[in-house]
Every structure is written in C-alpha cells, then in structure tokens.
Amino acid sequence: MSEDFMLDTDDIERRMDGAISSLKTEFASLRTGRASASMLEPVMVDAYGQRTPINQVGTVNVPEPRMVTINVWDKGLVGKVEKAIRESGLGINPQLNGTIIMLPIPELNEERRRELSKVAGQYAEHARVSIRNIRRDGMDQIKKAKADGLSEDDQKLWEGEVQEITDRYIKGIDDQLATKQAEIMQV
C-alpha cells in the first residue's frame, strides 16, 4: 500500500498559486501615488439597479503617470461614477469634463507611504499563513500515509518536496513584498 502513495504536488502548487493570485489582487488595490487602472477595480457604481464595476460603465485609461481618465459611456451615469469614486476611500478628487472624469493622483506624504508599506506587509503575512496552511495539509497527508505503511525514507522524501515547494512560494511572496514596498516608498 505504501508503494501506491502519491502526493498530489500539482494540487498543492495550484492552491499556493491561488494564495499568490489573491496577494497580487490585494497589492493592486494599494494606491502608490502612481496612476493605474487596477486601482479602481474595487470601486462599484450603482448603475442600472445593481452594483457594477467602473470598467463596465466606461473606458479607464492612464494617459499620464499621475492621471487616470474614465470615459463614461452613458451620460446619465457620470454623477454616479463620480460619487462612487468620492466615497471609495481612495482619496482621489474627480474632475468632470463632459462624459470624461479625470482623476489626478496626488503625491503621497511620508506618513501615508509608511502606512501603506505596513498594510502591504500585512497582506504578505496573510499570504504566507495561507501557504503554510497548505503545507500543513500536505504534511498531514504524508503522516496519514506513514500510518498506513509509508516507509520513513519515502516520508522524508515527500516532506522535503513539500518543504521545497513551500520555500519557493514564500520566497516569491517576500520578493513581491519587497518590490511593492519599494514602489510605495518611491517619491
């Protein structure tokens, strides 16, 4: 029976990829003082009787490093899009020009940069915890197989493989965090 044990490392990696994907989404929502279309992804507009993402009511562009524009398709929604942005907590003051909403991105002060850097660190720690939980699930499968007759050598081999995958993903999180924090702190 122990010869038949195969740990599904593809499943472990797929689940860890999900944690990394969530981290990237959280990082994208952090405003770094540089314009990006992704910073508006969490903003929802009350349009046509339902909450709708901004990119479904207009075209989002980044014409300059510190400017985002939204070309709203339905003139009747311009006010609702403006209101959604003001209430989003992004700290951006929309300026109207017909059906185009311009969003000048203000510089971040030093205190706000430090705050955002800490938030990025918290997001990274949540991702690390997710990775470690997935690692623990893999290790539990190996321990169960050991109880069912898996040899100690095979157990060590599988545990080493799970640890190597975990280390690789944790390093990826640390690298992404360092990049994001450098981006946030850049003036």
UniProtKB/Swiss-Prot annotation:
This is Ribosome-recycling factor. The gene is frr. Keywords: Cytoplasm, Protein biosynthesis. Responsible for the release of ribosomes from messenger RNA at the termination of protein biosynthesis. May increase the efficiency of translation by recycling ribosomes from one round of translation to another. One of its GO terms (biological process) is cytoplasmic translational termination. GO terms for molecular function: ribosomal large subunit binding. It comes from the Bacteria. InterPro entries: Ribosome_recyc_fac, Ribosome_recyc_fac_dom, RRF_sf. Belongs to the RRF family. It is found in: Cytoplasm. GO terms for cellular component: cytosol. It holds the Pfam family RRF. Gene3D superfamilies: 3.30.1360.40, Ribosome-recycling factor (1.10.132.20).
